[in-house]
Amino acid sequence: MPIVDHNQAPEVPWRPGYRKWDVAGREQGASSTLSINTAEPGTGAPLHTHTMDELIVILDGTLEVQVDGVTHTVGKDHTLVIPPGCEHAFRVVGEENARLMVFFPTLDPYSNGQTRYLEGSRPDSVRA
């Protein structure tokens, strides 16, 4: 059973102003994916869908979240439960960076066929 020191987790190239560290996945023998993310105000994720659930735990900061066309402002100590096929996007609002924990019940959740971008482009590490 691997025990992962978050400070030793590899950083994955993502988006300008948005940093991502994979803390659990294939390298740890898991069949799911867990990452810690930090995002600066004004950054986030463009509108997209996944073929599987996504859980986003807001550890710090505030997000403006668009889910199936409805916009919500969601802060620290809340969890976004995003079912398969749900159109969603978010951006950090306010002056504080956001810190997020993101879970997928699969490996390679951003690969072709698993994630469809409706706006914007794929993150740097998963460009086709």
Predicted regions and their residues:
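Short beta-strand His + acidic residue motifs that chelate non-heme Fe in jelly-roll/DSBH
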Residues: 47, 65-66, 82, 88-95
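A short, N-terminal "cap"/entry segment at the start of jelly-roll beta-barrel domains
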Residues: 1-31, 115-128
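A generic "binding-loop/recognition-motif" signal
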Residues: 19, 43, 51, 70, ...
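Short acidic-glycine-tyrosine-enriched beta hairpin
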Residues: 69-84
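Short coil/loop residues immediately preceding or within conserved phosphate-binding loops
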Residues: 18, 34, 53
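Conserved short histidine dyad/triad with adjacent acidic residue
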Residues: 34-49
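Glycine- and acidic-residue-biased ligand/ion/polar-headgroup-sensing regions
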Residues: 53-63, 68
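A short hydrophobic beta-strand segment most commonly corresponding to one strand
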Residues: 34-37, 81, 95-112
